[in-house]
Amino acid sequence: MIFPRKKPAPVTAPWWQAQTRAKSSKGSVALIAVLAGAAGGILGVNASGASIFNRVNLVSSTSTIQRAPDSVAGTAQRVLPSVVSIQTRSLTGGGTGSGFFIDSDGYILTNNHVISSAAQTGGRIQVKLNDGRIFTAKVVGRDASYDLAVLKIAASGLKALQFGDSDQVAVGDSVIAIGSPLGLSGTVTTGIISAKNRPVTAGDSSNESSFINALQTDAAINPGNSGGPLVDSTGSVIGVNSAIA
């Protein structure tokens, strides 16, 4: 008895290997998508070399994102113009920190340890605003026991931050820290109040250190954040970032 010879199954390459033109069937089509704006097309070439074009309509959205004023983004947008970056140069080296305007005439609150070396040795203190302008600042006053200092720049019409009541802050309240960690100005981090009345020693040297009862937060704070504001959900200042764990 003679059985008909079975036709061997065609051997196909795995999907990840390119097919040669000789092995491509006439019905196969290579497609390249071309998308532009709200309308576009699909351009391709079939096995015979003829071009094909199928038009497609794409829907684009022109709506803008509406953010609540008390959202993190909304609060940061209001606070950022009032926050500055601080760079110091002194005989012992340089440093960076943050600060914020406490009135419209150029008065800035920061940490004493940010500018203490420059203040002691007659060094230079430069302040960079959120809009990119740079000013030389002078020290109006400083208090090592509270790790606070006030600077002044020759500018006016500036946006100052409002102060809140840190005594009314509760553990678990949301907070936002803004400053220039690692020299990265305009950095925003969020967290909560983790604890109150934490005993903290702040400062760079033993003769100008301070022992304060501080608010503890889990918001990311790094070198360069010192002197920047810690604000509540309304954008009011409830603390000054002075130390990191």
Indicate where each model-derived feature is located.
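N-terminal targeting leaders characterized by basic, low-complexity, disordered sequences
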Residues: 1-18
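Serine-dependent protease modules
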Residues: 2-5, 22-245
